[in-house]
Amino acid sequence: MASQVQPGQKPKVQPCRYKTGKTLGAGLYSVVKECVHIDTGQYYAAKVINKRLMVGREHMVRNEIAILKQVSTGHQNILTLVDYFETMNNLYLVTDLALGGELFDRICRKGSYYESDAADLVRAILSAVAYLHDHGIVHRDLKPENLLFRTPEDNADLLIADFGLSRIMDEEQLHVLTTTCGTPGYMAPEIFDKSGHGKPVDIWAIGLITYFMLCGYTPFDRETNLEEVQAIATANFSFTPVEYWRGVSQEARDFIKRCLTVNPKKRMTAHQALQHPWINPPYDTTDDLGSGEDLLPNIKKNFNARRTLHKAIDTVRAINKLRENGGLMMDGIMSVDPKPEHVNGSEVVEDRTTPRERENEDAMEIDSRSNARGQTEQQIREQERKVKETVAGLWSRTAPRSER
């Protein structure tokens, strides 16, 4: 049973009632672990948030608790909050255990994947978003990583998770939110120009997710951040390369276009989207959508290349965070600096570069926008090689200089 907390009031500090197990996922400020209630033996997922790393951001956690308390038991496609409390060092959000994995990991493990499968998944997302909007809640951070399956079964519920950036708002306050929030590639145009935003930002994100679900890459990938923002601001996208979209129906493309409408007032609402012919066809279109073409081969190729790069990006961000916090502190123990390494062909070998030479190397940067759109197999292998080389050299750049 969750601790009773009034709005704006901190959870009571108390001993942890759960024993944590294997790690299910991790971010910059938190880690999600499997846990078991010490008294009942029931298994859950615990989002463990380091209070020291969240200094100045505590409101995000309080907000997530408030949102989940209000909606988590009212819809089958929203993750259920079971408990919340804090210990001396951590904040805990305990939810039902979603064992089915993330959306795209699950898709890539399937033997086949058709447009009708995508429509079914988007319908479930829309149903949950319509429920949130009916309760005056804007999620503001919808993306594939925040969509989890309840169980590994084929008919498992798809769940919306991570309400840290969500907001509760009255109907007359529909467009008063002005803070920049969310994941840049999934932000709506009105978030960037800070003209005020509300429920339509979730529909924009659903359009992006749908596009991604049909090809394995995102529509606004550009060479620079500025070009990406400009493309989002004008909804400058296309259904290309043609070979990845040849098997996708016009109904699906129209649905995406109506979600990715620049003017939020002209964008579909969640309830309107649920009535779109692609989501709610007038007849059984299972055999018609995309002419029954299996979309999985192209999606796996594009998504796996994108995932390889983003794993490296997450590593860079995590290590940069460790730098900010004064060294390689892991679970309260100073990590021993491993031998520096680099990639020679396909082998990781000891790096004999001197500390002075390493100091003069260029700063490490990885472009987070790349998503392998339309890459050849050779280009993908080259990208993976570069990522491996970058990750292998990370540790040699993170140890305090006094230790080198």
From Swiss-Prot:
Residues 338-370, 379-389 have a biased composition (Basic and acidic residues). Residues 301-323 are annotated as: Calmodulin-binding. The keyword Cell cycle applies. The active site is at residue 141. Gene3D superfamilies: Phosphorylase Kinase, domain 1, Transferase(Phosphotransferase) domain 1. ATP binds at residues 24-32, 47. Residues 279-322 are annotated as: Autoinhibitory domain. Activated by Ca(2+)/calmodulin. Binding of calmodulin results in conformational change that relieves intrasteric autoinhibition and allows phosphorylation of Thr-179 within the activation loop by cmkC. Residues 18-279 form the Protein kinase domain. It comes from the Eukaryota. The keyword Nucleotide-binding applies. Calcium/calmodulin-dependent protein kinase that operates in the calcium-triggered CaMKK-CaMK1 signaling cascade. Required in G1-phase of the cell cycle for proper timing of the initial nuclear division after germination, but not for subsequent mitoses. Required for the normal temporal regulation of nimX activity. Belongs to the protein kinase superfamily. CAMK Ser/Thr protein kinase family. CaMK subfamily. The autoinhibitory domain overlaps with the calmodulin binding region and interacts in the inactive folded state with the catalytic domain as a pseudosubstrate. This is Calcium/calmodulin-dependent protein kinase cmkB. It comes from Emericella nidulans. The lineage of its organism: Eukaryota, Fungi, Dikarya, Ascomycota, Pezizomycotina.
